[in-house]
């Protein structure tokens, strides 16, 4: 029997009746509360350890209960009962020790609360005033933050001033939801109305002044000024409105662009961030090299690398310095070689301006260097800069850009429009952060490749250096650059360098694994989201895999750190929210509940922006000049250079040319016994499937040369499932940026695979068939935890893994699917359609065929059990073919222009995220 023992006050009245006979209560000053399980005439078992709840924290059960909806004057309200505590009994110490006075009772009152769920535009605008002093206190904040998704500034002002045009003509109303609740204590209804409107307009001017930047006439702001002059003459609001109008009129020549561009001028002052902006800023790096000659002679830390001489010849070969690669994927990704790449993490975006800076940056490197002293050829190498300095400078750049992000530009309804004609000006502050992300990733790829004379051990030292930089970024809680570095190290052009990774130290690789786990796509990137929640506003990072010195350093110095998140997570969340929830309910009522959900994400962004003010980092001109001057490599250039450094083997080339998949079979056989043909001897790093997220260890140079892994498209800000596909030997297809738009993805692009239905990028480690052979360092322990999983081309127990591709002529994409002995053909076809983003199609319109040879295919009967109907002696390669007798619409290839169907991934949503 179990009895909860609370310490009672003196006297019999203070105790509780025993639940069971034979139980007894006990109290300890140290334990406060104990549980005893006992039986008569037996020794009780006492539970001494338990998790104590802070009595000051809210109770686990929800204090709010929704009971229904009400329709009042054209507005739908969500009705809920909220329990509010009226009296706090006893102090915290008394409650903790169990001595709380029984007379001190916790009294609660149940209140009926209305919150706007949906309504017409007129009613939503009208509700601003009563909500200001009503119970829906957050309504005004949410409305001002999200109204751009369903109306314009001019419409809101027109409706607001029409409804409350003359304060002196307003009659009071006591009914909630009409005009404005008031009390005699605060003056009459007219005074309260003036105060409410003044507060609403004042908040609007202070927090969203860019809404009124409409040069050259500024009609909205002038309309507001006229209203204030008439109804609130001499008020502080009138003064602020006149001041803002004067400022905008004086800055008109500079800001004569669409209102969404207003934040752009604020991005210009910081020279370190110039490369992250539009091409127009590319020339700015030219003056920057001025300080570069000074740094060149003082490479104190440069002793770390023996490749220092390499930079000189590198000037003409572009690979050696480092440039902004254009996008980076998640920990399990293999970003394709360079600026216009398509790999990206869970929440990725496409940046139109990104390619433009390429031509402008390339010429800027030689010219400024030559213009300086004879030191021009002594360009500093990456290893001249200590990892902590590099991480700090990246953090400074990222934090400045993130603080300038206009939060509502992240809304899915705005960000998803950026690629449309005439919308190129949208969200410039977000584009700047994307460009910076791509620049960091490109810098990593270029420096790791070095030039043609760089040896594998030297490249390994550079890789180790970047891993240390990533670790320092983690300490600084800079998740943006951390993600960019990890993604670049997992890019196709880097991860295929088998010899380079063989020389990477065990400790560095272990750190790399730990850091990569942060961005695991498992459960909608739950780990990175939890970290962001845990450390978002904390003073220091909570690290486990770092040395003790790294743990103590921030605390010893007393430096409080901010947090720079990976913005793609939030963009994904908001785009997914925009897709998942309807804009209108019951035909014409604006779904304001959707705006509440969006504001929850926006509020997180604002909170983290304020946390960025905690950083106190001084810019380093030498590093800034070096970083801005780094030359960009295109996707093809970085891939070709990688192939020159470590040429692909002939066997791999033949395999790719014939598009045979037998190599996959052997590659998976390596999981049980290393093969001399597919792997070399020797091993130092063994790891589990989860650890295989580290891109470079996923495959050897032989096969990975022609394989590419990518993820999320930005138009949907969704994360595509990572798949490995046979593609031409070199990425000659259209170059793509890291945060490529999913709507532009197609099988024609090397390594492009369609978005997964689960909307989370599936790492190669979690899709066994997608994994490629590892090199000699990792073959022995390739996947300890996967021994129970079925191997490709082999039926294990009652399940197997098959690969299903679409019946198209412009690519050979496939999706790996787990088939059990219970799966019928329609279920397998539906799985394949979901993987290929064909959710809108019907399974009845498709048929499943097994490819036995180049000229033979086995058709799986409509209702057959695929596990038993398939030919188990042939390759487990299938094709999803549209039936000829149906009037089907054009089959979607690659990623869909719309977001894939969401499954239960936390709102999955959100990309994120976080």
Curated annotation (Swiss-Prot):
Keyword Secreted: no
N-terminal Ras-GEF domain ranges (all copies): 112-249
Main location: cytoplasm
Keyword Metal-binding: no
GO biological process, alphabetically ordered: Ras protein signal transduction
Residue ranges occupied by any Ras-GEF domain in the UniProt entry: 386-648
Taxonomy, superkingdom: Eukaryota
TM region positions: none
GO cellular component terms listed in the entry, alphabetical order: brush border; cytosol; nucleus; plasma membrane
PTM sites of type Phosphotyrosine: 814
SMART domains xrefs: RA (SM00314), RasGEF (SM00147), RasGEFN (SM00229)
Signal peptide: none
Domain Ras-associating, chain residue ranges per copy: 798-885
Domain comment in the entry: The Ras-associating domain interacts with Ras.
The protein's name: Ral guanine nucleotide dissociation stimulator
Classification of source organism: Eukaryota, Metazoa, Chordata, Craniata, Vertebrata
């Amino acid at each position: 029997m179990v009895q909860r023992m609370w310490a009672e006050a003196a006297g019999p009245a203070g105790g509780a009746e025993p639940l069971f006979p034979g139980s007894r209560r006990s109290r300890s000053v140290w334990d406060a509360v104990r549980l005893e399980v006992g039986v008569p005439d037996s020794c009780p078992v006492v539970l001494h350890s338990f998790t104590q709840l802070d009595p000051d924290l809210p109770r686990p059960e929800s204090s709010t209960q929704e009971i229904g909806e009400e329709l009042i004057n054209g507005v739908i309200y969500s009705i809920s009962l909220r329990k509010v505590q009226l009296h706090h009994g006893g102090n915290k110490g008394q409650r903790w020790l169990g001595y709380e006075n029984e007379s001190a009772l916790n009294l609660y009152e149940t209140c009926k609360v209305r919150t706007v769920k949906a309504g017409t535009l007129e009613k939503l605008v009208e509700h601003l005033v009563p909500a200001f002093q009503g119970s829906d206190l957050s309504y005004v904040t949410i409305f001002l933050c999200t109204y751009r998704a369903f109306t314009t500034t001019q419409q809101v002002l027109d409706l607001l001033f029409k409804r409350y045009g003359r304060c002196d003509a307003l009659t009071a109303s006591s009914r909630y939801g009409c005009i404005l609740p008031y009390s005699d204590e605060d003056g009459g209804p007219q005074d309260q109305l003036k105060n409410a409107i003044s507060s609403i307009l004042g908040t609007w001017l202070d927090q969203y002044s860019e809404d009124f930047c409409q040069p050259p006439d500024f009609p909205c702001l002038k309309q507001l000024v006229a209203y204030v002059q008439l109804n609130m003459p001499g008020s502080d609001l009138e003064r602020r409105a006149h001041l803002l109008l004067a400022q905008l009129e004086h800055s008109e020549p500079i800001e004569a662009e669409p209102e969404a561009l207003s934040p752009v001028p604020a991005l210009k002052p910081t020279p370190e961030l110039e490369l992250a902006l539009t091409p127009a800023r590319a020339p700015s790096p030219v003056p920057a090299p001025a300080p570069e000659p000074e740094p060149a002679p003082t490479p104190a830390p440069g002793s770390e690398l023996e490749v220092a001489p390499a930079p000189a010849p590198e000037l003409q070969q572009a690979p050696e310095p480092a440039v902004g690669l254009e996008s980076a994927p998640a920990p399990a990704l293999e970003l394709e070689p360079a600026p216009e790449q398509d790999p990206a993490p869970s929440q990725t975006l496409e940046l139109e301006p990104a390619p433009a800076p390429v031509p402008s940056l390339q010429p800027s490197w030689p010219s400024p260097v030559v213009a300086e002293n004879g030191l021009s050829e002594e360009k500093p190498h990456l290893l001249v800069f200590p990892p902590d300095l590099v991480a700090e400078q990246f953090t400074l750049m990222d934090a400045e850009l993130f603080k300038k992000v206009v939060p509502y530009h992240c809304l899915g309804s705005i960000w998803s429009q950026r690629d449309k004609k005439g919308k190129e000006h949208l969200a410039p502050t977000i584009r700047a952060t994307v460009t910076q992300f791509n620049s960091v990733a490109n810098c990593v790829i270029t420096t790791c490749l070095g030039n043609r004379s760089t040896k594998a051990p030297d490249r390994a030292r550079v890789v180790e250096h970047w891993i240390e930089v990533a670790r320092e970024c983690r300490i600084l809680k800079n998740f943006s650059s951390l993600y960019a570095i990890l993604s670049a190290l997992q890019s196709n052009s880097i991860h295929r360098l088998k010899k380079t990774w063989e020389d990477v130290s065990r400790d560095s690789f272990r750190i790399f694994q730990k850091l990569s786990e942060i961005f695991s796509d498992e459960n909608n990137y739950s780990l990175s989201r939890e970290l962001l929640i845990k450390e978002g506003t904390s003073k220091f990072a909570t690290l486990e895999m770092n040395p003790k010195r790294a743990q103590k350093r921030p605390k010893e110095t007393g430096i409080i750190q901010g947090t720079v998140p990976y913005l793609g997570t939030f963009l994904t969340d908001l785009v997914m929210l925009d897709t998942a929830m309807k804009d209108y309910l019951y035909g014409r009522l604006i779904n304001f509940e959707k705006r509440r959900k969006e504001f929850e994400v926006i509020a997180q962004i604002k909170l983290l922006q304020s946390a960025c003010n905690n950083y106190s980092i001084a810019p380093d001109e030498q590093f800034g000049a070096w970083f801005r001057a780094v030359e960009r490599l295109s996707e093809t250039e970085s891939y070709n250079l990688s192939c020159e450094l470590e040429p692909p083997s002939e066997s791999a080339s033949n395999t790719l040319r014939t598009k045979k998949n037998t190599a996959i079979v052997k590659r998976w056989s390596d999981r049980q016994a290393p093969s001399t043909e597919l792997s070399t001897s020797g091993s130092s790093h063994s790891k589990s499937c989860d650890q295989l997220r580290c891109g470079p260890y996923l495959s050897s140079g032989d096969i990975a040369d022609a394989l590419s892994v990518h993820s999320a498209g930005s138009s949907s800000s969704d994360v595509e499932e990572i798949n490995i596909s046979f593609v031409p030997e070199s990425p000659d297809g259209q170059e793509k940026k890291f945060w490529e738009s999913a709507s532009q993805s197609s099988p024609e692009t090397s390594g492009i695979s369609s978005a997964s239905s689960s909307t989370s990028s599936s790492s190669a480690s979690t899709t066994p068939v997608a994994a490629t052979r590892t090199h000699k360092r990792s073959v022995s322990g390739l996947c300890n935890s996967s021994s129970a999983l079925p191997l490709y081309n082999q039926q294990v127990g009652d399940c197997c893994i098959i690969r299903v591709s679409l019946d198209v002529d412009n690519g050979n994409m496939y999706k790996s699917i787990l088939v059990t002995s219970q799966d019928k053909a329609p279920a397998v076809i539906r799985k394949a359609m979901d993987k290929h983003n064909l959710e809108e199609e019907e399974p009845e319109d498709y048929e499943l065929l097994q490819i036995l040879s180049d000229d033979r295919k086995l058709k799986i009967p409509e209702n057959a059990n695929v596990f038993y109907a398939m030919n188990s002696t042939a390759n487990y390669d299938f094709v999803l073919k549209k039936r000829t007798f149906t009037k089907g619409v054009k089959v979607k290839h690659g990623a869909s222009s719309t977001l894939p169907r969401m499954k239960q991934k936390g709102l999955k949503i959100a990309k994120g995220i976080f």
